[in-house]
């Protein structure tokens, strides 16, 4: 009876599962009706199949939908408790991940940097302070902290008051040597709303020194100094440092799919190698070693950036699943990764999706959307209590809602009681 009641629920609720903030075209409406009819019949067909065969049968029928005449999908579902794959379809096909690339970046970052890592911005100077006058050079040293904000800048300004400085004579430099001079990622579209890849930002903008000088003057400090860019000397004295934790960065990076935060994380990975300046190539090398560690060949994939904006990223559902498995089996990574993932029906980019009782609060996964691509990768718990990880990449979908609907139905089947 329990299985029968669930299947009745599945039949009547699946067509409305995905909450989409996109205008519905006439083609979408007709496809929705056709999909709903197919779902109803395949749910009835799955009535008496045991887990996981019933889900496999359900997925097989979903894959017969008309949308796959003009689009592709790769998916893999892995039972973490049984340590075995339960669903595979085109799982090794190379596809653009869109923002599920952020999951790869996040796992690599926690693995390489550790859960206590902090993003740091420093204020340093050379010279001397006499009679309330600082004569020398000031260095604002960027560590690519995307959360550096007005409060942090005020702390920089207040540090001079604490030193008794009311006049600055010399130079005020931006030290941006933490990373290379590339301000855009490889393979980014010129007409996208791309973040600026500068290691010294304020409010996400590359106007740090201008804002700093303005705040100094507003606080009554006389600034008689030229501005420019230069590396901080080794003998410079650091007045104050501002920090943000890796968890703070992960939270916005994954829940809100923030591209700037993801690229900052990508360059922290690169910086951890000790190479200066940090480059995308260095980050790729670190992630490549992690891919080897999970038993796959990094040369099979193309990793261009940390956010998934690039047209040059090519990964597979298998790669994403194996990295999610690695994170789960390494407690420190999982401890920091899981709370940062969007939660179905509750927050982030999944707030308005999968609100039914079995998936809401259960599915924790990263979404991905770029033109023609819709993806979802993360974790959920099946009705039998087993933890699952999964990756679904829809490619060639001209209406993202169709990909999201497919992904939601897969997750509902995984989470619902049999």
Located regions from the model:
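A small/polar active-site loop signature that marks catalytic segments
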Residues: 205-338
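Active-site-adjacent helix/loop patches that line small-molecule binding or acyl-intermediate pockets
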Residues: 43, 47, 121-127, 133-216, ...
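Soluble periplasmic/extracytoplasmic beta-strand elements of cell-envelope proteins
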Residues: 74-78, 86-88, 105, 137-141, ...
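Bacterial Sec-dependent N-terminal signal peptides
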Residues: 1-26, 46
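Extracytoplasmic
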Residues: 68-72, 90-92, 98-101, 116-118, ...
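C-terminal soluble interaction/assembly domains
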Residues: 302-418
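Beta-lactamase-like hydrolase cores
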Residues: 21-81, 87-94, 158-164
């Amino acid at each position: 009876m329990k299985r029968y009641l669930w299947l009745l629920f599945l039949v009547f609720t699946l067509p409305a599962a995905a909450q989409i903030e996109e205008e519905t075209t006439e083609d979408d409406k007709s496809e929705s009706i056709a999909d709903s009819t197919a779902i109803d019949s395949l749910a009835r067909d799955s009535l008496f199949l045991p887990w996981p065969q019933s889900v496999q049968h359900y997925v097989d029928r979903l894959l017969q939908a008309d949308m796959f005449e003009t689009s592709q999908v790769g998916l893999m579902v892995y039972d973490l408790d049984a340590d075995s794959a339960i669903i595979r379809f085109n799982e090794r096909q190379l596809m653009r991940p869109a923002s599920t690339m952020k999951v790869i970046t996040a796992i690599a970052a926690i693995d390489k940097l550790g859960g206590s890592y902090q993003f740091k911005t420093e204020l340093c100077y050379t010279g001397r302070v006499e009679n309330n006058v600082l004569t020398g050079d000031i260095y604002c040293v960027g560590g690519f902290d995307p959360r550096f904000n007005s409060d942090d800048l005020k702390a920089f300004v207040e540090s001079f008051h604490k030193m008794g400085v009311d006049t600055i004579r010399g130079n005020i430099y931006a030290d941006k040597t933490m990373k290379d001079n590339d301000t855009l990622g490889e393979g980014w579209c010129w007409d996208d709303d791309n973040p600026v890849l500068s290691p010294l930002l304020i409010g996400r903008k590359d106007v740090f020194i201008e804002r700093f000088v303005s705040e100094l003057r507003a606080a009554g400090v006389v600034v008689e100094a030229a501005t420019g860019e230069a590396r901080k000397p080794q003998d410079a004295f650091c007045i104050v440092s501002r920090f943000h934790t890796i968890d703070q960065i992960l939270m916005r990076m994954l829940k809100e799919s923030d591209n700037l935060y993801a690229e900052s994380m990508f360059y922290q990975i690169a910086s951890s190698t000790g190479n200066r300046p940090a480059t995308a190539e260095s980050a790729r090398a670190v992630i490549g070693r992690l891919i080897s560690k999970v038993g796959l060949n990094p040369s099979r994939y193309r990793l261009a950036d940390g956010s998934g904006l690039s047209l040059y990223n090519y990964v597979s559902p298998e790669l994403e699943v194996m990295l999610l498995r690695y994170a789960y089996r390494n407690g420190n990574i999982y401890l920091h990764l899981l709370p940062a993932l969007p939660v179905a029906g509750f927050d982030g980019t999944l707030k308005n999706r999968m609100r039914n009782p079995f998936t809401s609060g259960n599915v924790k996964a990263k979404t991905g959307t770029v033109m023609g691509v819709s993806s979802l990768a993360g974790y959920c718990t099946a009705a039998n209590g087993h933890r699952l990880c999964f990756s679904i990449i829809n490619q060639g979908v001209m209406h993202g809602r169709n990909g999201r609907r497919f992904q939601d139905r897969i997750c509902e089947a995984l989470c619902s009681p049999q």
